[in-house]
Amino acid sequence: MRKSGRRLLALALLWPVLLVPSQAPARELLAVGAPFERVFEYQESGEYGGLGAELLRLMAARTGNTVRFRMVPWARAQAMLVQGQADILIGPYKTPERIASMGFSDKPFYQDQMVFYTRQDASFGWDGDYAVLKNRRVVLLNGWAYGAEWERVRPGLQVSVANNVENGLKMLVHNHVDVFVSNRRNTDPVIARLGYGRQVKPLPKVIEVQNGYFAFPRSPTFDKLRLQFDQELNNLIETGELKKLGKRYDVSVP
């Protein structure tokens, strides 16, 4: 009876443990990205900030993980994810090519307006007809996605590539190009920092609205992590927490 009682006691103590779902072991995740204004930034304190960084810290903590960050040029950040050298990419827009090589979060966490920037004294205007760009020099950013319609008309244009927003703006100001294509979130703060407010202007008509996501390596081994982060992001959306964070960082959220 004593042995039987001990067995029953041991089973009673073990029973709650058996009912708890197994948790994936904690991991230190590497999140990579390029400097994206108010989404992913390197701060003077030496910490990484922005809406994307804060969301990843929250979601990592709530899934029992930790996260560290690395900032590299955008084309390199994408390559690191695709090659399995990083666990999360911060902020990509969806394109058919990226969907084929990356696993995107179920929902976006921010939204951008893509526009044309010109010099203040330029007579160029845009009403949606891409034909007006045919004889104008255009600069794009390396590795950025501008939408399906833009990709359709791009082959017939005079296109240069810049590695960052600052270089693109300088090319415009110094008359190396006529039009700079970018988004307002990334570009307007740089215009202010460089003192270009009286030299360049965004055209009022929006080219396209793009949604920004988190992306993971397209591998079955990352499916569970992606689904966990999807659940946490959905919770942040449903509770209104994402909306509050968007206001704090001055980032548009869907």
Residue ranges, per PLM feature:
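Bacterial N-terminal signal peptides
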Residues: A10-V20
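Short loop->beta-strand "edge-of-pocket" segments that line small-molecule binding or catalytic clefts
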Residues: E28-Y42, W126-W144
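Short helices/loops that flank or line small-molecule/ion binding pockets
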Residues: A75-D87, G103-F104, E166-R185, R193-L194
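Ligand-binding clefts/hinges and TM-proximal coupling segments of bilobed small-molecule sensing domains
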Residues: T66, W144-S160, R198, L233-P254
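Extended ligand-binding regions for polar small-molecule ligands
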Residues: G50-R62, A122-F124, N135-R136, W144, ...
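A ligand-binding cleft/hinge motif common to bilobed small-molecule-binding domains
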Residues: A79, G91-A100, D178-Q199, P204-E208
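Extracytoplasmic small-molecule ligand-binding "clamshell" domains
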Residues: A26-S101, V161-A162, R248
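Periplasmic-binding protein-like
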Residues: A34-F36, Q111-V115, A192-D230, S252-P254
